[in-house]
Structure formats: structure tokens, C-alpha cells
């Protein structure tokens, strides 16, 4: 907790260990294999992997065509970025980023190491996500706050500014695209 507080409140720099990168690459290989359709079920069809090539919740049995998988993931982030209210304090948002980076670095989520590297770069640069203080989805309670972080990290060049999340850079509150360009 002491180091978490130092990162969140004092800007202690953080980095990713080579062993964490190796673990993430191992699980990423499995996710990429699943997303490519090369994992097969008993009938020889691409294996359904919840949330990777299927819908979510009541749409879990709906198979998503491979050409729509990126759209599925982006729309999930957009749909869950539904928080409202004043932003949480910056140190709370920074702690959230570090805790999520730490969880992803364990290698059980199938994410790219570049995602964790980018999260740590946010922390090290002082570019802090604006995370609304109210609203969430699901029993975990962290989906909406993390979706606001996701908007900041996963927008495309053609996205309107108001769909790129928001971040603090210095004392300025900016759209995500502008904050990340600094």
C-alpha cells in the first residue's frame, strides 16, 4: 500500500518487468488463437469464447463473426462508459490505473503487454484519466470506471473528441486525444 500511495500521490515512476511481459505474451497467444477461430469445438466449429467471439450477458450464445470482433470490444467500452458526477480525485484515478496494470501484468487476462506499458506510461507522464465518481455496471462495480479509462486508451483517429475519454494533464482537463498528444 505504501508504494501504491507513492505512485498515486507522489508520482513514483513505475515499470514492467520482463517476467510479467513473458506471462502476458503466454496468455495473449491463447487469446489470439481463440480469436482467429483455430480453436475448435466437438462439431469442428470455432470454439465459443465468452466475450472474445460471443456477445455478453444474455447474448452470450450469439457468435460474433471474426471481422466484427474489434467492433464488439470497442462497443463494449463505449456502452459501459456511463459514469456521471464529479470525477474521483486524481490520486484515486491513478491508484485505479496502477491496480489494473498490476492485475493485467499477472498474465491471466490475455492482454497485450503494450496495454500495460501504456497504462504505466500514463502514470509516469502525469496524464491522469478523468473517472466519474458515480455509476457502474455489473457485480464487480468497476466496469464503468474502467470503461472511462478504456476510452482514453482505445480511441481511433476518426473518433469524435467527445468519444476519446478525458484526462488531466497538468492542471488542464482535456479530451483524451489532446491529453495523449502532449
Q: How would you name each of these model-derived features?
A:
Residues 1-182:
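Conserved, well-structured ligand/cofactor-binding cores
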Amino acid at each position: 500500500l505504501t508504494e501504491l500511495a507513492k505512485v498515486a500521490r507522489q508520482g513514483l515512476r513505475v515499470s514492467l518487468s520482463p517476467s510479467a511481459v513473458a506471462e502476458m505474451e503466454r496468455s495473449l497467444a491463447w487469446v489470439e488463437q481463440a480469436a482467429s477461430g483455430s480453436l475448435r469445438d466437438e462439431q469442428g466449429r470455432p470454439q465459443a469464447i465468452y466475450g472474445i467471439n460471443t456477445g455478453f450477458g444474455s447474448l452470450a450464445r450469439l457468435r460474433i463473426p471474426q471481422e466484427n470482433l474489434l467492433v464488439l470490444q470497442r462497443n463494449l467500452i463505449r456502452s459501459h462508459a456511463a459514469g456521471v458526477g464529479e470525477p474521483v480525485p486524481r490520486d484515486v484515478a491513478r491508484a485505479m490505473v496502477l491496480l489494473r496494470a498490476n492485475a493485467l501484468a499477472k498474465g491471466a487476462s490475455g492482454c497485450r503487454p503494450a496495454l500495460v506499458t501504456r497504462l504505466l506510461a500514463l502514470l509516469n507522464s502525469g496524464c491522469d484519466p478523468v473517472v466519474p465518481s458515480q455509476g457502474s455496471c455489473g457485480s464487480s462495480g468497476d466496469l464503468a470506471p474502467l470503461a472511462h479509462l478504456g476510452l482514453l486508451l482505445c480511441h481511433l483517429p476518426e473518433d469524435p473528441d467527445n468519444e476519446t475519454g478525458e484526462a488531466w494533464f497538468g492542471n488542464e482537463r482535456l479530451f483524451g486525444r489532446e491529453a495523449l498528444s502532449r
